Amino acid sequence: MLLTIIALKSCGNENNAPKFKIKANQKTFVSGDTLHLSIQNKNKTAYDSVQFSLRGARINPTYVFPEDALLGDIPTEAVVFIEGKEFRTTTNVRLLNIKAPSLYTYTLVNEYPHDKQAYTQGLEFDGERLYESTGLRGKSSLRRVNFKTGAVEKQIDLDGTYFGEGLTLINGKIIQLTWQENIGFIYDQESMAMKSSFTYEQSKEGWGLCNDGTVLYKSDGSAKIWTLDATTQKEVSYIEATTNKTIITKINELEWVNGAIYANTYQSQKDVVLIINPKNGAVDGIIDFDGLRSKVEQIEGLDVLNGIAYHPGRKTFFVTGKN
């Protein structure tokens, strides 16, 4: 099976340049599988040697995927050497989870009022205080909410140019994302006064956000969940949400619960929450919230399930949706 994106570097005429492709022995792999890489040489050009790498780390042409390998589409590169010149070609090798996710259902234990106009993007508890980020340009806000009554205790409205997205609380600060504006905001948690901002790097959009007490986890609408330094907000690495069959895209709102990332998926065919291993991206579980949407008032503009807030004291999840 050929998985190929060609990127060549040469000094001569590109039409006459050697054309190489990376060939893998399988379409997909799981941990423990053996990867065999070789070069397909379209022009049958003689070459001196070839060097392979996965995620920038050099490997032998025969490589066994370790148990703790990062899942998803692995950037793979070959450097072909011909008479002192280098020719590069890249592709992705897909590594899937070795086991299927566990399936869970839910028990509804209570209902609370919620602003029907709130286009909820982020939701997180600190004790009994519920913090919420809402979206849509001209309607985006940061809120502190009394979850029992639904009353908004304090609200900071964003400038109309911004589309609010996920939020998280860490070290006395609130960090809030925007969607396509390439900027995140940092607030003092108690006063909710804005203190500073930061710009995105490789992740061009802001979707969901959570933290484990040390680092931040940020989704960007793809399958990727980025790890960010909590102090500088710089991107460090990423994982990809991956099952035993596929890579799941449109990862949205995030919540950190007992060592795992719980995630909504935007515009999914089903109202589900994924349970993701933050170490390698494995989707270890899926919570099916089927039927939950029918239990709320069927207002005009009722949108998708979004917003997960875990209450550690009650050991329950508070979930809502956009509008």
Segments from the language model and where they lie:
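Beta-rich, blade/repeat-based domains predominating
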Residues: 116-127, 160-171, 201-213, 246-259, ...
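Short loop/turn segments that connect beta-strands within beta-propeller blades
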Residues: 145-150, 188-192, 230-233, 277-281
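Conserved beta-strand positions in repeat-built beta-propeller and related beta-rich domains
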Residues: 132-137, 176-181, 218-222, 263-268, ...
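C-terminal motif of bacterial Sec signal peptides marking the signal peptidase cleavage site
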Residues: 8-10
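Surface-exposed, short loops/turns at beta-strand junctions within beta-sandwich domains
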Residues: 65-73
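Blade-loop segments of beta-propeller domains
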Residues: 150-187, 192-203
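A short helix->beta-strand "capping" segment at the edge of beta-propeller domains
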Residues: 96-117, 147-153
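A short beta-strand motif characteristic of beta-propeller blades
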Residues: 107-113, 151-157, 193-199, 237-246, ...
